[in-house]
Amino acid sequence: MESQYNAAAIEQKWQQDWVKQGLDKTPENSNKPKFYALSMFPYPSGNLHMGHVRNYVITDVIARLKRLQGYRVLHPMGWDAFGLPAENAAIDRGIPPAEWTYKNMSQMKQQLQTLGLSIDWEREVATCAPEYYKWTQWLFLQLYQAGLAYQKEAAVNWDPIDQTVLANEQVDSEGYSWRSGAKVERKLLRQWFLKITDYAEQLLTDLDKLPGWPDRVKLMQENWIGKSVGAYLEFPIKGSEEKIAVFTTRPDTVYGVTYVVLAPEHPLTLKVTTPEQKAAVDAFIEEVSNESEIERTAEDKPKRGILTGGTAINPFNGQEIPILIADYVLYEYGTGAVMGVPAHDTRDFKFAKEKQLPIKVVIIPENSDNTNPPLTEAYTDPGIMVNSGIFDGIQSTEGKTAIIEYAEKEGYGKARIQYRLRDWLISRQRYWGCPIPVVHCPSCGTVAVPDADLPVKLPENVEFTGRDASPLAKLEDWINVPCPSCGEPAKRETDTMDTFIDSSWYYLRYTDANNNQEAFNLEKANDWMAIDQYVGGIEHAILHLLYSRFFTKALRDRGLVNIDEPFKRLLTQGMVQGLTYKNPQTGKYVPSENVIFQDDHYRDKETGEILSFFYEKMSKSKYNGVDPKQVLGKYGADTARMFILFKAPPEKDLEWDDADVEGQFRFLNRVWRLVANYLENKPKTVKKASELTKEDKDLRRAIHTAIKEISEDLEGDYQFNTAVSELMKLSNALTDAKCLESGVYQEGIETLLILLAPFAPHIAEELWHNLGYEKSIHLQSWPTVNPDALVVDEITLVIQIMGKTRGTIQVSATATKDELEKLARESEVGQRYLDGQDVKKVIVVPGKLVNFVIAK
């Protein structure tokens, strides 16, 4: 074998060889247990970043491990290829989105292949390909026919730069678009929605079926679904037959209601507004109308409101209370109205103080007898109901039930469960997305495109002049079609689908990616699903993961799959962070090449100013990124993989460190030299097991300890970093061992390479073949622990006198307490320190030490 480790040569060689062998193809007919390993597929931006590399390397190690452990493995890859960036690139560069996207996919695929990922590329999918989005459209129609897809007029978040609708999740807490950075506006449009709310309770309760998910992610979904148990109460409007309906989780406070608040958009707002207040109310509505929901409900923003002049009546006590409108009440949430209980709600208390509204105490602490205490803040804890008519003296927690029963009896309201989750708005006014397969007919209304006419393809003769209206809305030849039902002139839907639709089912397509007759074969999908290990970023905790769970349940109810949940286990890998330099005076980031270390400080090379330094997520704007191509070019894929796996536990953030990269490169070189030395000095005959020396047994123990520790590290939480540490320990044990003529040494070399194979697949394969094997190392079996090899024949016994260590001796691991004391006394150390001494007490800790207490 070559004396020097040449990563570039062996990696290229084996990547080509694995393709020829078809090593990464998914076994179709096998009796082996299945394992489906999947990384969240990328958007084809054109270049891999280190976050990508970490994600895909983690999944690849798991896939390779499971193959070695005897599983048939599905490990596919594809492209989340629709979306605004491609369309914006077409505008900026003057090239079609498809051309830009497919070029990027090709480029990124080559980059992924250089990492040595064991991906079955024959199952590659691209969501922008007609053969994929045909089935996205078909699945949409399944939901439409089931009543889960519908259109309605809705106030939406409008991005004025990208000229499209944004879901609430795509607007930040300051009211800006997550992608373009534009200030989001409110706009009334007819939009398509999916009834995810029909599955709210299932989505919530089935989180208990996911023990393999991080608690943090489950909590985020639980909060987003936002189940509230309470009551629906109605407040009559004075002088009207109308009533204001509110939802409350605190019916026990209803006697403390001193005002009600409507959303500015509420249909009753204009009806309750008096002529005197109309001008002010109209101005307020106009002011609020351009603010996003996120902006209006932000907790740190002052709440604004105005009196309408109207009055409501609290049916429980007959009191007249003012009606206001306020920005923090949203018509799309709940009933679009809330009751104000300032004495027992923090937000209401602050709002009432600002508006000089009455504050009425109806709950007091159990140990208090003051029924009208002065308040400096809202009292929100449980207590005793007061000033509440027939409910005075009742525990407030019991009062909730009592009030609801009374309301139902008197016709004031009823018990109700409400969810924060809203239906999923899927319309997008853009070109580069999956067309919604419906036609609007003046006679027939909305008509589904027949299955035989799918896919509704995106037209190619599109002119991109700027980010104004959707290009599809201008294409008369494409829009105008006969109605599929009556044959009369009709128009296509010009909105496209939210790209999260594409990614809500892609994992199912992988199970049968080349099927031209159906989205996926039911038998194949049910065979491979659910995904055994899913890997991706925490940023997808709510959107993608929740939508995919909804899709799976909806398709289950259509008889298309037989599972409740798509992802058994979820690993959310941490970010890759780079060393970042920043001028604290100007706030500007400084590239590393402009930084010098001088007088114990990092300084700007040009100005000499002291810079602050820290680790942050890699990005171009912070000049702290590391190009994977440069790392692979200098060290090779195996070194990059080893560093990423060793530097931090997978769920933690990883701080990039060139010195540690170099350290992993040195380790692989040591492994190379270790095998080269073994082959150079390999004996012609091997000792029999019965002839094993103590050194042989110690080495075998080190080998099987490594198998045990690494196997345990790679189950459960996938602690790759500690597994790599164990690989290093085994390598060191083999380097230090002198028993090359022993069969144990050969076992150690082979075991090291198989254990290394999932982490550094190229060097492991090369060295395996150098040992003389023809069959790929990746087709071997994961080593199993021999319990007998872990048994320790001898241990090191510490001898202490008065608690101080005086020496050690080797003793049998099975020696009794009496035998240990005897051996310690008879040892050279014992005789030297105990001769002529009066031993008062002997403390024996089996397997560790003997401590002699002597008289002073």
UniProtKB/Swiss-Prot annotation:
Q: Which InterPro entries match?
A: aa-tRNA-synth_I_CS, aa-tRNA-synth_Ia, Leu-tRNA-ligase, Leu_tRNA-synth_edit, M/V/L/I-tRNA-synth_anticd-bd, Methionyl/Leucyl_tRNA_Synth, Rossmann-like_a/b/a_fold, tRNAsynth_Ia_anticodon-bd
Question: SUPFAM superfamilies, alphabetically?
Answer: Anticodon-binding domain of a subclass of class I aminoacyl-tRNA synthetases, Nucleotidylyl transferase, ValRS/IleRS/LeuRS editing domain
Query: What's the superkingdom here?
Result: Bacteria
* Residues engaged in binding ATP: K620
**Catalytic function, reaction form:** tRNA(Leu) + L-leucine + ATP = L-leucyl-tRNA(Leu) + AMP + diphosphate
Motif 'KMSKS' region, residue numbers: 617-621
**Keyword set includes ATP-binding:** yes
Q: Name one GO biological process term.
A: leucyl-tRNA aminoacylation
Q: Which Gene3D superfamilies does the annotation name?
A: HUPs, Isoleucyl-tRNA Synthetase, Domain 1
Q: Does the keyword Nucleotide-binding apply?
A: yes
Q: Name one GO cellular component term.
A: cytosol
Compartment(s): Cytoplasm
Keywords associated with the record: Aminoacyl-tRNA synthetase, ATP-binding, Cytoplasm, Ligase, Nucleotide-binding, Protein biosynthesis
Please tell me which stretches of this chain the record labels as motif 'HIGH' region.
42-52
List its EC numbers: 6.1.1.4
Tell me a Gene Ontology molecular-function term this record carries.
leucine-tRNA ligase activity
Query: Which family does the record claim for this protein?
Result: Belongs to the class-I aminoacyl-tRNA synthetase family.
* Name of the protein in its database record: Leucine--tRNA ligase
The protein's organism comes out as: Rippkaea orientalis (strain PCC 8801 / RF-1) (Cyanothece sp. (strain PCC 8801))
